[in-house]
Amino acid sequence: GTLITPENARKIKEAGVQRCSISIDGYNAEKHDAFRCVPGAFDATMRGIECLKAEGVEFQINTTVTRDNLHDFKKIFELCERIGAAAWHIFLLVPMGRAAELADQVITAQEYEDVLHWFYDFRKTTSMHLKATCAPHYYRIMRQRAREEGVSVTPATFGMDAMTRGCLGGTGFCFISHVGQVQPCGYLTLDCGNV
């Protein structure tokens, strides 16, 4: 979102882009900028979002779950709602690639369970589309909680989540790198050819 200007937003709209993904990893400038290691990133992101909104382009917020922002999740959720995000996608930190340097930010197994239960509860309170990425265990939690609540897991009650069964890498999508290498997922460096 930091590079979106009024001109870029207009071009995005003219190109027919239906939704842009914007990363926000903290509910305020101090928290977000510290994670991104870029002073001013939060404010620039907010300006970019306003440019998209002015052009009528939907946006979703992507948030990486880390030790540093775990306890701020309700505040990040509230920020997403306040700024008018169409969706909030959380990404469980996979310490691969550049994220290998963030291994100390990986949360515990119990914290993952807790955050995914919170996420399940959040989805009941909002019209935003919520999606947990790199979190196949969310779908276990969703089914367990729905069963406890007497709710059938169908597309009518859970949308596309009703049809998702675990990791989609290599089955529901693939990753193509900047040099054309095809992989089942950006985190699984299995060479499947080159475009």
Locations of the language-model features?
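Radical SAM/AdoMet-radical enzyme domain recognition
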Residues: 1-95
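Structured helix-beta-strand junction loops
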Residues: 15, 55, 125-126, 170
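Glycine-rich, flexible loop/turn motifs
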Residues: 31, 38, 98, 103, ...
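Residue-level preference for long, well-ordered alpha-helices that form the structural scaffold
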Residues: 38-41, 69, 104, 108-112, ...
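Generic structural signal for nonpolar/small residues that stabilize regular secondary structure
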Residues: 61, 80, 88, 119, ...
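Flexible glycine/acidic-rich beta-alpha junction loops that bind and position SAM and/or redox cofactors
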Residues: 68, 87-107, 129-147
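A structural motif corresponding to the C-terminal lobe/cap of the Radical SAM core domain
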Residues: 82, 101-127, 189
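Accessory C-terminal segments flanking Radical SAM cores
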Residues: 95, 135-195
